[in-house]
Amino acid sequence: MSDWNPSLYLHFAAERSRPAVELLARVPLENIEYIADLGCGPGNSTALLHQRWPAARITGIDSSPAMIAEARSALPDCLFVEADIRNWQPEQALDLIFANASLQWLPDHYELFPHLVSLLSPLGVLAVQMPDNWLEPTHVLMREVAWEQNYPDRGREPLAGVHAYYDILSEAGCEVDIWRTTYYHQMPSHQAIIDWVTATGLRPWLQDLTESEQQHFLTRYHQMLEEQYPLQENGQILLAFPRLFIVARRRE
């Protein structure tokens, strides 16, 4: 599991794209020229940006070669660059930086977010959506299984919190709109939950394990999911998935 799997990620494409659609709807920009899609993945969020601003110069950034290859194939009119978000520098100031479900993987948001604001043009917008599920059973159980089986903690850090992000971005010279939404995804089985998180949150836990160790981990994880996520009357499972949204507009 050394690289991301675009096919597995896109298995829940509609569910993963919905927050991007709702974030994009809150971006208060009309005619703009330069856009960066940070953590563009296979290009599903980039496609939304291209649909809204077809004349804009859009650059998608991702550290995964597989994701970049998939995005280039899907959107030949956009530029895609394999790079680390923290180190990438645009050639010109950006009118919009769009980051859908990517910045949660990076550390030290107290430095990262002001850095991103510095890349914006005056009145430019930083639009961010991050999963806020560190305390949800899906992610708590990952840590519990790892502890039980004596594996090191490889999960991402919790988000800084609403008040922290508001202060960080206000001090960086932005007007800030911030909100949190919990989605309830209908899942047909506990295995479907595993399929969902294997493409994202579970990757760091599994990537350094042998095939046998992965199977041992997933078997125990499945057992614990069954305890935490009861079936609905119709046999479906409701997977609560909170997400944090931020739209920060740089002052002139």
Curated annotation (Swiss-Prot):
Where in or outside the cell it occurs: the entry states:
Cytoplasm
**How is this protein annotated for GO cellular component?**
cytoplasm
**Under the GO molecular function aspect, what terms does this record hold?**
trans-aconitate 2-methyltransferase activity
The record's function comment reads: Catalyzes the S-adenosylmethionine monomethyl esterification of trans-aconitate.
- Cited CDD domains: AdoMet_MTases
BP term (GO), one:
methylation
* Alphabetized UniProt keyword annotations: Cytoplasm, Methyltransferase, S-adenosyl-L-methionine, Transferase
The family annotation for this protein states: Belongs to the methyltransferase superfamily. Tam family.
Q: Which InterPro entries match?
A: Methyltransf_25, SAM-dependent_MTases_sf, Trans-aconitate_MeTrfase, Trans_acon_MeTrfase_C
Which reaction is recorded as catalysed by this protein?
A: trans-aconitate + S-adenosyl-L-methionine = (E)-3-(methoxycarbonyl)pent-2-enedioate + S-adenosyl-L-homocysteine
Give its E.C. classification number.
2.1.1.144
Gene name, per UniProt, is tam
The molecule here is called: Trans-aconitate 2-methyltransferase
The source's domain of life comes to: Bacteria
Q: Which Pfam families match?
A: Methyltransf_25 (PF13649)
**First-listed, main subcellular location of the protein, grouped into a coarse class:** cytoplasm
